[in-house]
Swiss-Prot record:
Keywords carried by this UniProt record: Cell membrane, Membrane, Transmembrane, Transmembrane helix, Virulence
Transmembrane segments: 23-43, 45-65
Described function: The VirB system could be required for the establishment of the replication niche in the host.
Gene, per the UniProt record: virB3
Name the record gives this protein: Type IV secretion system protein virB3
Note: Transcription of the operon is maximal in early exponential phase.
Induction: Specifically induced within macrophages by phagosome acidification. Induced at 37 degrees Celsius in minimal medium, suggesting that nutritional stress is a regulating signal.
Statement: the UniProt record of this protein carries the keyword Transmembrane helix: yes
Topology term for the membrane: Multi-pass membrane protein
Domain of life from the UniProt record: Bacteria
GO CC field: plasma membrane
Amino acid sequence: MTTAPQESNARSAGYRGDPIFKGCTRPAMLFGVPVIPLVIVGGSIVLLSVWISMFILPLIVPIVLVMRQITQTDDQMFRLLGLKAQFRLIHFNRTGRFWRASAYSPIAFTKRKRES
């Protein structure tokens, strides 16, 4: 006759979580820089060089080197900087402009119908 196993340690019981495979979350990189920030910065410099002067075009090399240094320790750094800009610098909510604060909740608030 078998019995239910005794749980000696409460931490080991239950859900332990799923493993995160770091390779699946890594952004596509070119020259050691994530592709999306590289395209945005490179495209901006190319547009400026067409509108202003072709002498601006060589600025791509040092800017890519600086971007490579930024992502050398953390490949998600530009994503984190973008999220910081989105949530701290750009206030899409009205209370952010007035109270200088923001609160984000995973709950979707819907209009409730009044019961009469």
